[in-house]
């Protein structure tokens, strides 16, 4: 097999600054995501002093805050954590779609990695599973993705 130069990110958060956006809506789930992200970054050498938690009402507000945080130059990465649980109306679809598109747009336009930890589930049980039980913790996964992406981008 041909050997290729490979660029990979190291999981070392030392010296990096993170903005963690967390929604208040469904906070009983979101708080578990935040705990997972903070714990993960700390285990990777990050300092709690280099993490800023920003609380917002809901997922729809996340992109505008992420945009301002990314543009500030104060953060190496933004981690967006929230939970949108399907209800009886189409509101879920509008919020989930626009928040998702907006967060992706922020990352592309700013060049600052944005971790997508917005749960979009059909039931409360599914959200709980993804916030630290059977489905792992998506807050950890979002933090890990941001950390690895930061370290890869440093090498490009």
From Swiss-Prot:
**InterPro entries noted in UniProt:** LS, LS/RS, LS/RS_sf
Task: State the active site.
Answer: 91 (proton donor)
One Pfam family here: DMRL_synthase
Q: What positions does the entry give for (2S)-2-hydroxy-3-oxobutyl phosphate binding?
A: 88-89, 130
Which keywords does UniProt give here?
Answer: Riboflavin biosynthesis, Transferase
- Molecular function GO labels: 6,7-dimethyl-8-ribityllumazine synthase activity
Tell me yes or no: is Hydrolase among this UniProt entry's keywords. no
Name the residues that bind 5-amino-6-(D-ribitylamino)uracil.
25, 59-61, 83-85, 116
**What is this enzyme's catalytic activity, as reactions?**
(2S)-2-hydroxy-3-oxobutyl phosphate + 5-amino-6-(D-ribitylamino)uracil = 6,7-dimethyl-8-(1-D-ribityl)lumazine + phosphate + 2 H2O + H(+)
Pathway linked to the protein: Cofactor biosynthesis; riboflavin biosynthesis; riboflavin from 2-hydroxy-3-oxobutyl phosphate and 5-amino-6-(D-ribitylamino)uracil: step 1/2
Q: Which GO terms describe its biological process?
A: riboflavin biosynthetic process
Give the EC number: 2.5.1.78
Q: What does this protein do?
A: Catalyzes the formation of 6,7-dimethyl-8-ribityllumazine by condensation of 5-amino-6-(D-ribitylamino)uracil with 3,4-dihydroxy-2-butanone 4-phosphate. This is the penultimate step in the biosynthesis of riboflavin.
Similarity remark? Belongs to the DMRL synthase family.
Q: What is this protein called?
A: 6,7-dimethyl-8-ribityllumazine synthase
The record lists the lineage as: Bacteria, Pseudomonadati, Thermodesulfobacteriota, Desulfovibrionia, Desulfovibrionales
């Amino acid at each position: 097999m041909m050997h290729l130069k490979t660029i990979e990110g190291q999981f070392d958060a030392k010296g990096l600054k993170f903005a963690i956006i967390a929604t208040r809506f469904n906070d009983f789930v979101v708080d578990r995501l935040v705990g997972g992200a903070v714990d993960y970054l700390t285990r990777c050498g990050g300092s709690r002093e280099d993490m800023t938690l920003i609380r917002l009402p809901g997922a729809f507000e996340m992109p505008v805050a992420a945009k301002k945080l990314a543009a500030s130059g104060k953060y190496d990465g933004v981690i967006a954590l929230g939970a949108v649980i399907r209800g009886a109306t189409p509101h879920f679809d509008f919020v989930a779609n626009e928040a998702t598109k907006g967060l992706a747009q922020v990352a592309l336009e700013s060049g600052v990695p944005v971790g997508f930890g917005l749960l979009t589930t059909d039931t409360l049980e599914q959200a709980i599973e993804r916030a630290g039980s059977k489905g792992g913790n998506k807050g950890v996964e979002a933090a890990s993705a941001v950390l690895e992406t930061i370290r890869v981008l440093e090498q490009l």
